[in-house]
Swiss-Prot record:
MF terms in GO: GTP binding; GTPase activity; translation elongation factor activity
Annotated family: Belongs to the TRAFAC class translation factor GTPase superfamily. Classic translation factor GTPase family. EF-G/EF-2 subfamily.
Protein residues bound to GTP: 17-24, 81-85, 135-138
GO cellular component terms listed in the entry, alphabetical order: cytoplasm
Full protein name: Elongation factor G
InterPro entries in the cross-refs: EF-G-like_DII, EFG_II, EFG_III, EFG_III/V, EFG_IV, EFG_V, EFG_V-like, G_TR_CS
Lineage: Bacteria, Pseudomonadati, Campylobacterota, Epsilonproteobacteria, Campylobacterales
CDD domains the record matches: EF-G, EFG_III, EFG_mtEFG1_IV, EFG_mtEFG_C, EFG_mtEFG_II
Keyword Transmembrane applies: no
Annotated organism of origin: Campylobacter lari (strain RM2100 / D67 / ATCC BAA-1060)
Disulfide pairings: none
BP GO terms, sorted: ribosome disassembly
Record key words, sorted: Cytoplasm, Elongation factor, GTP-binding, Nucleotide-binding, Protein biosynthesis
Amino acid sequence: MSRTTPLKRVRNIGIAAHIDAGKTTTSERILFFTGMSHKIGEVHDGAATMDWMEQEKERGITITSAATTCFWKNHQINLIDTPGHVDFTIEVERSMRVLDGAVAVFCSVGGVQPQSETVWRQANKYGVPRIVFVNKMDRIGANFFNVEEQIKNRLKGNPVPLQIPIGAEDNFKGVIDLITMKALVWEDESKPTDYVEKEIPAELKEKAEEYRVKMIEAVSETSDELMEKYLGGEELTQDEIKAGIKAGCLSLSMVPMLCGTAFKNKGVQPLLDAVVAYLPAPDEVANIKGEYEDGTEVSVKSTDDGEFAALAFKIMTDPFVGQLTFVRVYRGSLESGSYAYNSTKDKKERIGRLLKMHSNKREEIKTLYAGEIGAVVGLKDTLTGDTLASEKDKVILERMDFPDPVISVAVEPKTKADQEKMSIALNKLAQEDPSFRVSTDEESGQTIISGMGELHLEIIVDRMLREFKVEAEVGQPQVAYRETIRKTVEQEYKYAKQSGGRGQYGHVFLRLEPLEPGSGYEFVNDIKGGVIPKEYIPAVDKGVQEALQNGVLAGYPVEDVKVTVYDGSYHEVDSSEMAFKLAASMGFKEGARKAGAVILEPMMKVEVETPEEYMGDVIGDLNKRRGQVNSMDERGGNKIITAFCPLAEMFGYSTDLRSQTQGRATYSMEFDHYDEVPKNVSEEIIKKRNG
């Protein structure tokens, strides 16, 4: 069967937004207007089709990006729902990798909020063209033009309104289309699909003219031809304006802005028209970079012909079909029942069934074509971020980077009988989510789970109960401390054992140097004249790496250290890899004790939005938690406080903040960097660890 939608008419888009901007409602309406779901799901009553996991329904927040296919004006739109909560930034990163364009939804009252900044940064990182939809225009305090200012000032974007609102709050009637210069009005609330084109209301004519001129100016800057025409005083045609907007959108030099209220069904159809008109088809975005095993780079172009190449970007467990692996096909096509080659793992995989997801319904398909997104059933070894390719062309597409977790808790099943069920559940969840890790504490034998924040781990424990029926007891949250050194030292260490028969001999001189934060570990071999034979150098490196696992102060992993082996000696008979590994390991530990070792802790970027009267209390409390306040702003009549706070002091913050501000303040928090722990705190940590 050949493809039904040509590549040119495919759009892979994500809806990205802050937690309450109305992203799920917007996705819902898109599905409704494109005819996929008949009754509109409301987040308010917890029945949205996009939010298909139980907890999302309860918390009213979107956690997993379900990929949904729908159709609008002969175009296939693959909608990837992205979560809007900071603990799930990894999900957002992951979906940004496979999207070609995004719709950024902002609340007309809240405007640009902390999570929007994070999502915007990630979209910039992956070069994702976007259009803005200012939602909730019917709410009290709605202000489209404020949001435009904030996108300019806070996000440093170049917003270009293609519409301006007619009225706001209760009087929001529709929008003025600045391209056709017509008013689009939704008159009958009971028939959300119908809107009428009218003349622009007299009182808005001047504003519409002013914004049309701004739009035309922005469009004329996208090409020399349009600029000449514009400067020569000629009118640009509607087609030229649209082509200019698309060019500006794709080059990221402008962000087209639209508005509406998804909840009241106003403004969604023009948004869909804009997705089709201005966001890129898979063959209009930059080629994706790939490499072969030997490191040669290659550029993979999105085409139907050519060897198959796809990226697995999400794994989910579905109660009916088992494990689903969501893939984005970049080149060629994939048939159900065929084989594909996992070039990241170097393994052959059999492709079972292929599914296309329509929010929570699934359709079985025979083939997945270039540019499309679907789910594969039956893959054994493929994890998030792996490449599936053809055996003839084993390309590895760009790998995704996943952050290290910053918080851990110990979990134990309520009953001993559940121990095995719990391990199975945790391993399945870890397969789905690369920012979540499971390990065993060697001393206590407890199972430790680690993730990106308190909410992240709460949801994992919750999913164990719901999906795998395992009840777990959760310990106190533990912070992922690290250690590093502050001084350069040189250390000699000789490991020599003589105990009948063959001895052990390894002798090294190591130089330990501190590195910039975030550099990790660097090993340098500076041995001259073979004083340590080449074959023992990897053992020295390995010995140092083993010592890095447990720092000298409190046994935390050591990072940001450069270790150079620059001298040493060996024994013809007694030297061995083992001896050099031990010499390096012990030498590093001795050196680290003299190198001014310090403990580092994760610092979180905290943003609190509070009514002015509680500002003093909030700041006082952040200072008590060893926080450093960086800035204070105003937004929508509230004060915004940004601070860096140690994660160790932030447990249970939401409850404290609620009681300080009578529940009127909100906050968001994400990991930012590691910083040195003050001496008094460091002493306490060491005392606790070394008991």
